[in-house]
């Protein structure tokens, strides 16, 4: 049961991070362009 809960939390956090990256693509593009 606890393993299932941990898996759910990890997948939810991964989805949240992915949606945040998708919501702000320009910031990451600028960082990639000027970071080199």
Curated annotation (Swiss-Prot):
Probable toxin. Does not show activity on the ACP receptor (ACPR) from the mosquito A.aegypti, on receptors of the closely related neuropeptides adipokinetic hormone and corazonin. In vivo, does not reveal any observable effects when injected into crickets (A.domesticus). Does not induce increase in intracellular calcium in mouse DRG neurons, suggesting that it does not induce pain. It comes from Doratifera vulnerans (Mottled cup moth). It is found in: Secreted. It comes from the Eukaryota. Its main location: secreted. Keywords: Amidation, Pyrrolidone carboxylic acid, Secreted, Signal, Toxin. Expressed by the venom secretory cell of the spine. The spine is a cuticular structure containing a single large nucleated venom-secreting cell at its base. It is an independent unit capable of producing, storing and injecting venom. On the back of D.vulnerans caterpillars, spines are grouped together by 50 to 100 to form scoli, of which there are eight in D.vulnerans. This is U-limacoditoxin(1)-Dv5.
